[in-house]
């Protein structure tokens, strides 16, 4: 990659050092330019005047005005050209009338000047430059790579570049092509930086803490997280079957939703509970560590027997809560009547409005757990479900050439596992392409009453 600024080539030099380790001293370049000698009080004329616009040096990270090493108290205004004949006439006229003349000056660029991408393009063998890794996912302080095989011999140098060229990065890891089959998280190797994998990641106005080596997290799904959260209404209850560390559950809780959040991975469950507390939603987001099928089957009766607090409006800040607490203490101390909190006046929430099933590899296989979900329920509980919950099920399909075929494939598999036909209240959302022959979708459907009130599986 070549970066050019009129008359000057600022691209890094051809790398001639070792390829087993990075020789930073090989990255040095001297750019001879002209400089205008001026008194400090006249610098503004040269920087702000129209005459100099096409002549001034405009290289990123290089100052246009420097001290004159030969004339104490004077300044040098650097130009972008090395030859006087290249200076525009209007600029040359200003230089002749308002300066102490021209002088030569060397602009020195070194390893610190160029970006990681520019250094890498110079460092790699020519046949590997096209398609070289140029991006990475950030999770907290961790830069997460997925290097192709041909770049593995240079993985530690790539890691070093990313670490040194990005201030937010403290740890660089590369995904190894194996995945924990039970809990979905990827194995990874440290390329550079600290072996510190407990991150604090911000998404959807929430703060998430987790060990990146022990739980599943995919930053590419933040748009999908936000999309579904917008569907939920604050007064509703959401049952998150495969909640992970809470990318759906915690923002839904902050919105005001009651949430039953479940994950089979003990580490995910641990951080899910921590994140609920850290985001001050642990009163309405309840964490569980169960098999997804078991969680679905228990969810309706669990909420009926242990309702979540009623929605009482937007959550107060810590400062507002503290002011209210002191006000109530003052009323009590003065012997006045202390008002009953709104949450205690209202009945708790006892009906699930949404089930979220974000386990695209196998979520469809859990849908049979909805069979007979409400069979045998007492009349009062059955009345709560005069309108069935919505189910949002993420899945993969190999039907990538046609949206119609993709939706048909997903619908067929869902209906087979549910044991009943879907209603007209069914929609499909394309999430992303994960491979050349594999797309991710979310199917949202109203749970058919004949499934929920039918025989248990």
Curated annotation (Swiss-Prot):
Which top EC class applies here? Answer: transferase
- Name the predominant localization: mitochondrion
Name the Gene3D superfamilies on file: Met-10+ protein-like domains (3.30.300.110), Vaccinia Virus protein VP39 (3.40.50.150)
Q: Which reaction does it catalyse?
A: guanosine(37) in tRNA + S-adenosyl-L-methionine = N(1)-methylguanosine(37) in tRNA + S-adenosyl-L-homocysteine + H(+)
| Keywords for this protein | Cytoplasm, Methyltransferase, Mitochondrion, Nucleus, S-adenosyl-L-methionine, Transferase, tRNA processing
Residue sites binding S-adenosyl-L-methionine per the record: 225, 263-264, 291-292, 358
InterPro entries, alphabetically? MeTrfase_TRM5/TYW2, SAM-dependent_MTases_sf, TRM5-TYW2-like_MTfase, TRM5/TYW2-like_N, tRNA_Gua_MeTrfase_euk
Give the record's GO biological process terms.
mitochondrial tRNA methylation; tRNA N1-guanine methylation
Q: Where in the cell is it found?
A: Mitochondrion matrix; Nucleus; Cytoplasm
Query: PROSITE patterns recorded for this chain?
Result: SAM_MT_TRM5_TYW2
State the Pfam families in the record.
TRM5-TYW2_MTfase (PF02475), TYW2_N_2 (PF25133)
What is any one of the record's Gene Ontology cellular component terms?
nucleus
Its Enzyme Commission number(s) read 2.1.1.228
CDD domains tied to this protein: AdoMet_MTases (cd02440)
Q: Which residues cross the membrane?
A: none
Q: Which residues form a coiled coil?
A: none
GO MF annotation: an example: tRNA (guanine(37)-N1)-methyltransferase activity
For whether the record's keyword set contains Methyltransferase, the answer is: yes
Q: What does this protein do?
A: Specifically methylates the N1 position of guanosine-37 in various cytoplasmic and mitochondrial tRNAs. Methylation is not dependent on the nature of the nucleoside 5' of the target nucleoside. This is the first step in the biosynthesis of wybutosine (yW), a modified base adjacent to the anticodon of tRNAs and required for accurate decoding.
- Family in the record: Belongs to the class I-like SAM-binding methyltransferase superfamily. TRM5/TYW2 family.
Q: How does it assemble?
A: Monomer.
Name assigned to this protein: tRNA (guanine(37)-N(1))-methyltransferase
Q: Which gene encodes it?
A: TRM5
């Amino acid at each position: 990659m070549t970066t050019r600024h009129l008359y000057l080539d600022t691209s890094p030099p051809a790398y001639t050092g070792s390829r087993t380790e990075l020789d930073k001293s090989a990255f040095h370049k001297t750019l001879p330019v002209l400089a205008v000698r001026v008194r400090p009080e006249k610098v503004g004329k040269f920087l702000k005047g129209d005459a100099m616009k096409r002549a001034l040096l405009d290289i990123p990270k290089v100052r246009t005005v420097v001290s004159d090493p030969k004339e104490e108290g004077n300044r040098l205004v650097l130009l972008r050209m090395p030859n006087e004949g290249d200076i525009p006439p209007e600029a040359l006229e200003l230089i002749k009338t308002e300066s102490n003349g021209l002088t030569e000056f060397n602009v020195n660029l070194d390893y610190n000047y160029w970006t990681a991408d520019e250094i890498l393009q110079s460092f790699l063998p020519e046949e590997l430059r096209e398609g070289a890794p140029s991006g990475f996912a950030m999770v907290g302080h961790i830069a997460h790579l997925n290097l192709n095989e041909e770049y593995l011999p240079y993985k530690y140098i790539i890691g070093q570049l990313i670490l040194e060229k990005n201030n937010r990065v403290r740890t660089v890891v590369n995904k190894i092509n194996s995945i924990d089959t039970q809990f979905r998280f990827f194995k990874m190797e440290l390329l550079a930086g600290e072996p510190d994998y407990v991150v604090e990641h911000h998404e959807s106005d929430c703060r998430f803490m987790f060990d990146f080596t022990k739980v599943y997290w995919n930053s590419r799904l933040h748009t999908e997280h936000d999309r579904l959260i917008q569907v939920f209404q604050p007064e509703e209850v959401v049952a998150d079957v495969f909640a992970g560390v809470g990318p759906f559950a915690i923002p839904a809780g902050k919105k005001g939703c009651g949430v039953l959040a479940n994950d089979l991975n003990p580490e995910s469950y641990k951080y899910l509970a921590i994140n609920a507390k850290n985001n001050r939603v642990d009163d309405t987001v309840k964490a569980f560590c169960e098999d997804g099928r078991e969680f679905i089957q228990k969810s309706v009766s669990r909420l009926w027997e242990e309702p979540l607090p009623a929605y009482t409006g937007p959550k107060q800040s810590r400062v507002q809560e503290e002011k209210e607490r002191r006000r109530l203490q003052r009323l009590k101390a003065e012997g006045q009547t202390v008002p009953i909190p709104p949450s205690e006046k209202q009945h708790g929430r006892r009906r699930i409005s949404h089930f979220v099933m974000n386990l695209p590899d196998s979520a469809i296989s859990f849908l049979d757990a909805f069979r007979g979900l409400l069979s045998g329920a007492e009349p009062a509980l059955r009345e709560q479900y005069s309108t069935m919950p919505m189910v949002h099920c993420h899945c993969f399909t190999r039907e990538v050439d046609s949206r119609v075929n993709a939706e048909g494939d997903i619908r067929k598999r869902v209906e087979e596992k549910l044991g009943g036909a879907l209603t007209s209240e069914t929609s499909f959302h394309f999430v992303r392409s994960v491979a050349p022959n594999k797309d991710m979708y979310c199917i949202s459907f109203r749970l058919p009453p004949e499934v929920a009130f039918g025989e248990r599986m």
